[in-house]
């Protein structure tokens, strides 16, 4: 299913469009409150002051250097005493700077984290509000996955940048500026030259970052496209699994990832260039600065060499500031691109896209009671992309209060579209709609919808309790603020009217039962009755029902008949394909091809002899079909007509309920190194790239130790005569330039190759992650919400990329640099180095290690928070129409706010502790410097250390300490990467373990060769409970056989276990006890992929995917194996021929927004065609005609008869007329088979089936 050309063009234009830039990121601060801004000002001041602490150290170093130089040339007892006193005094200043910096870093780190959380909480809420305030028409153009990705993942990127990383950036810039201020105070001439080079460097980096950000913005658009594909697949994962279509979604996903790889590789040169420029110009600055400093000294323009060295130390600290900027730049680049995406939603205030903005002056007659008189005048409407064909054409209708109106007509006649327009989801292309004489587009949309109760054809419930789902129907009404007791009374009354009370109270947790993600834990009929109760609970003046009985059995369908005949206090509009329900209405409106064909009472329309009579006669003919027109029986071998009875039905012992035999294992948690080793082992083809990058890492790691040696020699230069100072300065300046060239080349190689490696590995693991998710068993998706999975698919590969790209190269370089610096220190003076290293380094590493542990713990907590947030947002946006219909926007806002507040509280508590170690690791190098100067001075005073050796060791160890601090600066990245690697590699290991178990089971059952006997399905004493509710048995001792060529009907009340039977046959789940043999072998002995190719299913709620109609029909087949004639034949057999001919692009018509412009009947016929084209040996149909009109139902029924040759069918339905000619009918109740036989046999028994039949025929024979 390729992306259509229009979408690809839109994506390309968006990717090429210039991003919003740094200004968009700064706009995030508009979400700060006055308190937040006050805190941020204080934090910024603290960051500025903490940044100034290290440059102030340069002044102390300058004074100490002068002391060391003077002492080195004298060395008498008096100068020794003065020297030691000066060393001790200046060392104390280092301690004072440590205390100050530690306090300041703690304040700004926690403060920025606190305010960033609050700002992004407000931004997330505003973003969600903006999305929920959109019109349905505008929202149809985007998927919930891409929108929820903006609210969660993109906002996560912004929050990460504006938390402590913002403080680090401010501190780094302050350190850089303060370094130059200190340098200027010592020698303005020398500093001015070096400043020019820094400005050139920053200008180049700015240009590179701007170019890199454009690439990053394009990547974000591509990843949003990936989210759309993933949401498409995960939204109806059972259909994807049943048709073996995972590889198609993977192929689409991979196509996008190929483009991200191409774009991502463009980042390599920019990253390499950024680091190359940064370090090259730094060393060129050293070279020029040292040459010029020596010149000024020899000319007498600088008398004190300590001033020159103060400038050099200030520049060294400024270098550290630039180093601190580097690792944080990718986060800000990502945040800028993310802000651009977020503000496109926040700035989308066009009238046609926003409900509230489009009607700022809309009236809200709250004090006027709504009478419920609805009138449509010359109303026409066409869907986007099908403007040449009106879905509704010049409709004139009037609906009076206290009356019920049934709207009937063939599938695609425009019935559901009419409901959408009454809900103000779309705006008519012509004409008007009036409520009590007011144009509804001049009314406040929320007030309008608060007067309307809606039951959709495919009802959407939230992942909450049954009680909460029904109580949501009170939102926006006067009853919303009732006491909990009064609300409970209303909910229970509504459930009784909806015939839901009995099944709800039988559940173990009653009204507190969770319905699961996308209501996966309840049956279709139960879901529909809950939706009806939600519509009835507030007793709104207008009731709209769109195929509200499609999933209900005949007995429960009578609730609608009761509502139709009892409309005294409301206006009831009911859409149905069931003509029988329409007979109870006060008036019937017949739509055909978007026009009102006829209207009147049931009797009037029958007398008129028009379309209504034809529909009525067609349905009557279907219902009255008897054995004179049986479903064709092509099988040549005799077929038994009686299914074996279950032990329970025959009085045998009831099967015991077993615990689930194969729970999903927890994802194993391994340390980061173990995960990296596994990645390295399986990515051998990328070892050459890694090895080149590794060599570059080792080379770059030697830059700073070499710098320490050079600076140590430089300290000696100024102790000689002027003529020697000049010649030595020329030589060492050249050395700095040579080292700069080496740094430029090695960092360019490191940046390019490590970025390239990250791009390749990220694409691989993104695809592998998605593949592993799609290969999970169905029970996995019962436990993990699709919103959570979408969040993980987006965030985990990004977090892993943070480690396995340039950051990994920098980490290796830093680690090696620490070792090299320590070795040099030991080589020059082992005594001094041992104290400096082993007294200072353990403190640095201990603080850093604890920081990493806490950061990892915080990252795990943040992942949970992000997943819960993503699930909530995804649920809300997936049920967008329900949210709009029940005016739940404000309620969703408050629920999400409570969710975020709870998350923030957990974040603050953990962050308060972690920040202590962060502050210590940021400032501990000052303590190390104090110790180093004190002990080094002592050794010099004792004559055990020369000036050159002191400065070489000191600079090596200080730089090593700075490097160690930078190493732990990656702790947040490491913590997130560890979680991401565990998730990605862990879920793959689950797939492999499951595959191994399946293979072992198949090997154990190899002796079960496929039998050619007539038995296709043989279930014996099967017991089953869903893994999510292991103590609630759904099937109890089921035993039956289905023979080749048979059509077996399965009927029963809602929730009796009918659909569960099909789920077991599709191998979505495994029986807890008993045996299931299919196609002549134990079901577990089949290769699961090959097995599913021999089956096809038509689900109760058919799903269309983004792509063409043709793509949707051939979902279960490979593209190269499909003949166009087969597609046409399958569609014709499913009754789609005329509909497809009417589409502007025929089979190539795009199903945008998961087929939002298709009617329920049209979707169902596409699903039937999808099953028929598979030519399955066993065809499973779950309510295949629930959304079809009588003519289409008769057509499908004939189709099923025509295709029966060599095929076995199991048909689950509430419509008894569909199965009356089946070879065997199974009647289920409470998870058991209570009756079985042919229609005639069951009618003669006058048991459950007889009662259901009498009920469906209104007591008529």
Curated annotation (Swiss-Prot):
Topology of the protein relative to the lipid bilayer: Multi-pass membrane protein
Domain ABC transmembrane type-1: 41-334, 691-976
Family listed: Belongs to the ABC transporter superfamily. ABCB family. Multidrug resistance exporter (TC 3.A.1.201) subfamily.
Glycosylation positions in this chain: 67, 396, 463, 1007, 1021, 1106
Localisation: Cell membrane
Effect of a null allele: Dicreases the production of 11'-deoxyverticillin A.
Name recorded for this polypeptide: ABC-type transmembrane transporter verA
Organism for this UniProt entry: Clonostachys rogersoniana
Keywords: ATP-binding, Cell membrane, Glycoprotein, Membrane, Nucleotide-binding, Repeat, Transmembrane, Transmembrane helix, Transport
TM region(s), chain numbering: 41-61, 92-112, 166-186, 190-210, 270-290, 308-328, 686-706, 734-754, 808-828, 830-850, 913-933, 950-970
Record: residues binding ATP: 409-416, 1052-1059
Gene: verA
């Amino acid at each position: 299913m390729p992306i259509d050309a229009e979408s690809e063009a839109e994506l390309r234009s968006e990717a090429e469009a210039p991003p919003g830039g740094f200004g968009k990121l700064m706009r995030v601060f508009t979400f700060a409150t006055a308190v937040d801004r006050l805190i941020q000002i204080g934090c910024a001041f603290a960051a500025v002051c903490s940044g100034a602490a290290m440059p102030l150290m340069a002044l102390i170093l300058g004074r100490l250097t002068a002391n060391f130089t003077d002492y080195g040339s004298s060395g008498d007892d008096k100068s020794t005493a003065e020297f030691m006193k000066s060393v001790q005094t200046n060392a104390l200043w280092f301690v004072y700077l440590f205390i100050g910096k530690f306090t300041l870093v703690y304040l700004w780190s926690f403060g920025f984290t606190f305010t960033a959380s609050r700002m992004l909480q407000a931004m997330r809420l505003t973003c969600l509000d903006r999305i929920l305030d959109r019109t349905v028409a505008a929202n149809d153009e985007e998927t919930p996955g891409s929108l929820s990705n903006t609210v969660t993942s993109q906002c996560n990127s912004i929050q990460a940048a504006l938390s402590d990383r913002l403080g680090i950036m401010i501190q780094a810039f302050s350190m850089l500026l303060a370094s130059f201020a200190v340098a200027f105070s010592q020698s303005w001439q020398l500093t001015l030259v070096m400043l020019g080079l820094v400005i050139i460097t920053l200008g180049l980096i700015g240009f590179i970052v701007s170019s890199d950000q454009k690439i990053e913005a394009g990547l974000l658009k591509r990843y949003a496209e990936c989210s759309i594909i993933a949401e498409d697949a995960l939204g109806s994962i059972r259909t994807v699994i049943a048709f073996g279509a995972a590889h198609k979604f993977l192929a689409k996903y991979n196509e996008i990832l190929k483009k991200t790889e191409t774009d991502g590789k463009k980042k390599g040169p920019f990253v390499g260039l950024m680091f190359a420029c940064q370090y090259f110009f730094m060393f060129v600055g050293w070279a020029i600065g040292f040459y010029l400093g020596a010149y000024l000294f020899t000319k007498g323009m600088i008398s004190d060499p300590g001033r020159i060295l103060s400038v050099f130390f200030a520049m060294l600290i400024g270098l550290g500031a630039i180093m601190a900027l580097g690792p944080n730049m990718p986060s800000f680049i990502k945040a800028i691109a993310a802000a651009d995406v977020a503000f496109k939603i926040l700035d989308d205030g066009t009238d046609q896209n926003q409900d509230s903005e489009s009607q700022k002056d809309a009236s809200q007659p709250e004090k006027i009671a709504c009478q419920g008189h609805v009138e449509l005048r010359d109303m026409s409407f066409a869907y986007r992309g099908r403007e040449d064909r009106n879905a509704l054409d010049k409709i004139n209708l009037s609906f009076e209060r206290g009356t019920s109106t049934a709207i009937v007509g063939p599938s695609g006649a425009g019935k559901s579209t009419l409901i959408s327009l009454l809900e103000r989801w779309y705006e008519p292309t012509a004409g008007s709609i009036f409520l009590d004489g007011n144009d509804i587009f001049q009314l406040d949309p929320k007030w309008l919808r608060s007067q309307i109760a809606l039951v959709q054809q495919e009802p959407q419930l939230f992942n909450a309790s049954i009680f909460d789902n029904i109580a949501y129907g009170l939102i926006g009404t006067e009853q919303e603020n009732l006491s909990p007791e009064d609300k409970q009374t209303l909910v229970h009354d509504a459930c009784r009217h909806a015939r839901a009370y009995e099944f709800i109270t039988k559940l173990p947790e009653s009204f507190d039962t969770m319905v699961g993600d996308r209501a996966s834990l309840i049956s279709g009929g139960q879901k529909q009755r809950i939706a009806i109760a939600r519509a009835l609970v507030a007793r709104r003046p207008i009731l709209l029902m769109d195929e509200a009985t499609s999933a209900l059995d005949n007995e429960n369908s009578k609730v609608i008949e009761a509502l139709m005949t009892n409309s005294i206090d409301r206006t009831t509009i009911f859409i149905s394909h069931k003509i029988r329900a329409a007979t109870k209405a006060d008036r019937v409106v017949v739509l055909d091809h978007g026009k009102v064909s006829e209207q009147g009472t049931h009797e009037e329309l029958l007398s008129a002899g028009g379309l209504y009579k034809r529909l009525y006669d067609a349905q009557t003919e279907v219902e009255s079909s008897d054995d004179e027109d049986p479903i064709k029986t092509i099988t040549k071998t005799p077929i038994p007509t009686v299914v074996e009875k279950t032990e329970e039905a025959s009085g045998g012992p009831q099967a015991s309920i077993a615990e689930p035999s194969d729970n999903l294992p927890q994802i194993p948690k391994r340390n980061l190194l173990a995960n990296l080793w596994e990645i390295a082992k399986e990515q051998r083809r990328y070892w050459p790239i890694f090895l080149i990058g590794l060599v570059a890492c080792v080379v770059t790691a030697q830059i700073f130790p070499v710098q320490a040696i050079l600076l140590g020699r430089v300290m000696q230069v100024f102790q000689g005569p002027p003529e020697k100072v000049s010649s030595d300065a020329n030589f060492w300046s050249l050395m700095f330039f040579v080292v700069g060239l080496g740094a430029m080349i090695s960092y360019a190689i490191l940046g390019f190759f490590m970025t390239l490696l990250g791009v390749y590995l990220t694409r691989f693991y993104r695809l592998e992650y998605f593949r592993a998710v799609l290969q999970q068993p169905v029970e996995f998706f019962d436990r993990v919400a699709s919103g959570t999975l979408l969040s993980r698919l987006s965030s985990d590969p990004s977090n892993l990329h943070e480690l396995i790209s340039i950051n990994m190269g920098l980490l290796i370089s830093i680690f090696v640099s620490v070792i090299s610096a320590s070795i040099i220190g030991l080589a020059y003076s082992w005594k001094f180095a041992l104290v400096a290293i082993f007294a200072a380094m353990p403190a640095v590493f201990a603080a850093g290690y604890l920081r990493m542990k806490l950061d990892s713990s915080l990252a795990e907590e943040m992942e949970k928070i992000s997943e819960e947030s993503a699930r909530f947002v995804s649920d809300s946006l997936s049920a967008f129409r329900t949210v709009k219909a029940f005016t739940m926007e404000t309620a969703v806002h408050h629920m999400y706010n409570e969710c975020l507040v709870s998350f923030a509280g957990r974040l603050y508590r953990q962050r308060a502790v972690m920040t202590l170690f962060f502050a210590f690791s940021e400032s501990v190098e000052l303590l190390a410097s104090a110790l180093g100067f004190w002990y080094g001075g002592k050794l010099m005073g004792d004559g055990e250390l020369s000036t050159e050796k002191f400065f070489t060791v000191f600079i090596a160890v200080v730089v090593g300490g700075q490097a160690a601090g930078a190493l732990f600066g990656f702790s947040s990245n490491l913590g997130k990467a560890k979680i991401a690697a565990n998730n990605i590699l862990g879920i793959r290991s689950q797939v492999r373990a499951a595959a191994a178990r399946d293979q072992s089971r198949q090997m154990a059952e190899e002796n079960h060769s496929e039998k050619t006997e007539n038995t296709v399905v043989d279930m014996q004493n099967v017991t089953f409970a869903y893994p999510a509710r292991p103590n609630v048995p759904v099937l109890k001792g089921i035993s039956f056989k289905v023979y080749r060529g048979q059509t077996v009907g399965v009927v029963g009340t809602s929730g009796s276990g009918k659909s569960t039977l099909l789920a077991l046959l599709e191998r979505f789940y495994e029986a807890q006890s008993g045996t299931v043999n299919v196609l002549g072998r134990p079901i577990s002995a089949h290769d699961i992929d090959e097995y599913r190719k021999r089956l096809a299913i038509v689900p109760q709620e058919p799903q269309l995917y983004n792509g063409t109609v043709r793509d949707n029909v051939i979902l279960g087949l490979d593209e190269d194996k499909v003949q166009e004639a087969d597609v046409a034949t399958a569609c014709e057999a499913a009754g789609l021929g005329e509909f497809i001919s009417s589409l502007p692009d025929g089979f190539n018509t795009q199903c945008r927004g998961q087929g939002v412009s298709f009617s329920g009947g049209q979707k169902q016929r596409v699903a039937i065609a999808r099953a028929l084209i598979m030519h399955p040996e066993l065809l499973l149909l779950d309510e295949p005609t629930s959304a079809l009109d009588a003519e289409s139902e008769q057509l499908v029924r004939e189709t099923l008869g025509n295709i029966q040759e060599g095929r076995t069918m199991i048909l689950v339905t509430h419509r008894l007329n569909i199965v009356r000619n089946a070879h065997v009918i199974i009647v289920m109740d409470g998870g058991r088979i209570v009756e079985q036989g042919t229609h005639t046999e069951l009618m003669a028994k006058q048991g459950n089936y007889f009662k259901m039949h009498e009920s469906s025929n209104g007591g008529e024979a």
